[in-house]
A protein has these predicted regions:
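Short glycine-rich or small-residue beta-strand-to-loop segments that form or flank ligand, phosphate
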Residues: 3-9, 64-68, 165-171
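N-terminal glycine-rich phosphate/adenylate-binding segment common to multiple enzyme folds
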Residues: 43-136
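N-terminal phosphate-binding or glycine-rich loops at protein starts, especially the Walker A/P-loop
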Residues: 1-37
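Loop-centered beta-sheet repeat module
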Residues: 162-186
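Short connector loops at secondary-structure junctions
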Residues: 34-44, 168-177
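Buried hydrophobic positions in well-ordered alpha/beta secondary-structure cores of metabolic enzymes
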Residues: 10-13, 62, 115, 153
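Residue-level detector of conserved catalytic or cofactor/ligand-binding positions
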Residues: 185-195
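Internal alpha/beta core interface subdomains
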Residues: 116, 121-169
Length: 195
C-alpha cells in the first residue's frame, strides 16, 4: 500500500484528479490518498493559496500528485508551484518529448528530454514594482544550483544511455549569470564519463 498526497487544485484540477484516480484504481494500484487542496479557492477559506498542511503532507508521504493550481495574478500571493519548488527543493524539472507508436507526426524519431533548473533564474519569482509603469524581475544564478542541475542532467544522460547533452543558455546576452551556468556545465562535459 502506498500513501500519496493528492493536491486537487482548482479550476479543472478536481476534474483531472478524479479521472486520474479512477485510472490508477482500475490499474489495481493500492493507494491511500491523502487529499489536500491548494490554489485560489483555498484563499477564501484559509487566507493563503498553499497552506502549511499541504507541504507537511507531501513531506510526510514523500510523494504527491498535483493537478493544475491557480495563483491569483497581482500582488499578495506567491505562485503555489514556486512555493512547492522552494519548500521541497524540487530543483530538476524533466520534460520528455517523444513520438508515440502508430501516431503519424510531422517529425519522426523525436526523443528529447529537457532538464530545467526549477528554483533559480526567473523561476525564483523575485520581483518588485519599481513604479506604476515599471516592474522588475531578478535573475539569480548560483554556482551551487548550476553545478547541481548540470550534475543531474549528465547523470540522467549516462543512466538513460543518452548520446548527447545540449546546454541551452542566453550566455551571449546574460554574460555573467548564464555565463556562470555555461562554464560550470562545460566542466561536466569535459569529464571522461560524460556523453
Amino acid at each position: 500500500m502506498h500513501n500519496i498526497t493528492l493536491i486537487k487544485g482548482d479550476g479543472i484540477g478536481p476534474e483531472i484528479t478524479d479521472a486520474v484516480v479512477k485510472i490508477i484504481k482500475a490499474a489495481g494500484v493500492d493507494i491511500v490518498w491523502d487529499i489536500q487542496t491548494a490554489g485560489a479557492d483555498v484563499i477564501e477559506k484559509e487566507g493563503v493559496p498553499l497552506p502549511q498542511r499541504v507541504i507537511d503532507s507531501v513531506k510526510r508521504n514523500k510523494i504527491a500528485l498535483k493537478s493544475p493550481v491557480t495563483t491569483p495574478i497581482g500582488k499578495g500571493f506567491r505562485s503555489v508551484n514556486v512555493q512547492l519548488r522552494k519548500e521541497l527543493d524540487l530543483y530538476a524539472n524533466l520534460r520528455p518529448c517523444y513520438n508515440l507508436p502508430n501516431i503519424e507526426t510531422r517529425y519522426e524519431n523525436v526523443d528529447i528530454v529537457v532538464v530545467r533548473e526549477n528554483t533559480e533564474d526567473l523561476y525564483a519569482g523575485i520581483e518588485r514594482q519599481v513604479d506604476e509603469n515599471t516592474a522588475e524581475s531578478i535573475k539569480i544564478i548560483t554556482r551551487a544550483a548550476s553545478e547541481r542541475i548540470a550534475e543531474f542532467a549528465f547523470d540522467y544522460a549516462v543512466k538513460n544511455n543518452r548520446k548527447e547533452v545540449c546546454v541551452v543558455t542566453k550566455a551571449n546576452i546574460c554574460k555573467l549569470s548564464d555565463g556562470l551556468f555555461l562554464d560550470l556545465s562545460l566542466i561536466h562535459i569535459s569529464e571522461p564519463t560524460r556523453p
